[in-house]
Amino acid sequence: MRSLATLHQSPASCSRSAPVAPCPARRANSSRRVARQGPRARASSPVVETESEDVDITPQIDAFEELVRLAVEKDPSLATLAEQHLRSKSKSAAPVSPFAAPSPGSPSASSMLGPSLGALPNQNKPAWLRQRAPQGEIYSGLKDQLRGLKLATVCEEAQCPNIGECWNGELATATIMLLGDTCTRGCRFCAVNTARTPPPPDPNEPVNTATAVASWGVGYVVLTSVDRDDMPDGGSEHFAATVRTLKQLRPGILVECLTPDFKGDLDAVRHLARSGLDVYAHNVETVERLQKRVRDPRAGYMQTLDVLRAAKECGVYTKSSIMLGLGETDDEVIDTMLDLKAVGVDIFTLGQYLQPTPHHLPVTEFVTPEKFEYWRKFGQEEIGFRYVASGPMVRSSYKAGEFFLHSMIESDRAKARAAQEGAAGRVRPL
């Protein structure tokens, strides 16, 4: 299944070559390149200057707290709800030292990636990636409820490292995985089960999913699915039926659908995009050069862009995500951002790839929190995405990100309603 929520246990980052200088426009002779909208922005990667080899380790940046802070900064009325989210997190979060002590013989500081990580890739993870095993009464209760309704979650199937955070606290939520727990594809980064002919989907799944989600009392939910190349429409109608049922039970809930590519069937994409969902998410996963190495051969970079373009044409918010740590370069990350922006993507997330098992792709390197913060600012300020979430533990479906998107969407709709009411007030009857 194609999802950053399916990032597993392996390290990642950008290239360790020399700092990136402003780049020229992408290869002009690339005949299949997406048409650009506006000039191609470029910026140098941040350079960390050190006076000696004994450099301080970059402090951990808490992605959850940062995203909540940004939401309150944009809309101060969210302050009370923000406190509730942060209390929720503090009850379940494992204490992790904000500084990682370098080990003897660790690599020297990199001008691109900041200070030494203290460990080579595929050895001990840096401190900012260490988390306590999920536990707690709320966690266990949610797990039992999902089992009782025979619902699969990407949180478990993809071994998401944030499960202890999202399944705990006052606003516990999970990302439901539709169409079963077995994928017809075999991406080399993903831990979800695979089979050529999975069991048929449960016909009661749309109702069971909507019932469970409606009972949680959350205002924003993410639905995702495995790839089902064995189904004529790739599962688009099953997905759409779940959205329609959920909207009937909870009309005010905002629904994000993190989808497969439906084999490139754009009619299936449009069918789901028009089902009543609010955010259409489909992940590019990695840069163009690494697609064949990382994703199943039936997926593709240009196919992903076509899916996102078709969804955007239906008038919904669109979102995509990329994993770092697979051997990509800074130039390639920038090119990917530009391609996504060119097809209208509103929301972009970046997270650390974590290798789920020894049989999956190895991690090339761990990316520092400092570098992730650079990409967040670059994506919003230089590329122009509406919203960027970037951090080692950030995943496409992430509770803190949902909080920010909820506030952004509600704010947009409130402004649209006010504009309509203002226009109606200016119309005088004859």
From Swiss-Prot:
Cofactor(s), names only, from the UniProt record: [4Fe-4S] cluster
Composition bias, Polar residues: 1-16
The protein, known as: Lipoyl synthase, chloroplastic
Pathway involvement of the protein, from the record: Protein modification; protein lipoylation via endogenous pathway; protein N(6)-(lipoyl)lysine from octanoyl-[acyl-carrier-protein]: step 2/2
Biased composition regions of type Low complexity, renumbered to the chain: 91-119
Family statement drawn from the similarity comment of this UniProt entry: Belongs to the radical SAM superfamily. Lipoyl synthase family.
The EC number(s) this enzyme carries: 2.8.1.8
Main location: plastid
Keyword tags: 4Fe-4S, Chloroplast, Iron, Iron-sulfur, Metal-binding, Plastid, S-adenosyl-L-methionine, Transferase, Transit peptide
InterPro entries reported for this sequence: Aldolase_TIM, Elp3/MiaA/NifB-like_rSAM, LIAS_N, Lipoyl_synth, Lipoyl_synth_chlpt, rSAM
Residues where [4Fe-4S] cluster 2 binds: C183, C187, C190
Record-listed [4Fe-4S] cluster 1 binding positions: C155, C160, C166, S397
Molecular function per GO: 4 iron, 4 sulfur cluster binding; lipoate synthase activity; metal ion binding
Cofactor detail note: Binds 2 [4Fe-4S] clusters per subunit. One cluster is coordinated with 3 cysteines and an exchangeable S-adenosyl-L-methionine.
Enzymatic reactions: [[Fe-S] cluster scaffold protein carrying a second [4Fe-4S](2+) cluster] + N(6)-octanoyl-L-lysyl-[protein] + 2 oxidized [2Fe-2S]-[ferredoxin] + 2 S-adenosyl-L-methionine + 4 H(+) = [[Fe-S] cluster scaffold protein] + N(6)-[(R)-dihydrolipoyl]-L-lysyl-[protein] + 4 Fe(3+) + 2 hydrogen sulfide + 2 5'-deoxyadenosine + 2 L-methionine + 2 reduced [2Fe-2S]-[ferredoxin]
Domain (Radical SAM core): residue spans on this chain: 166-386
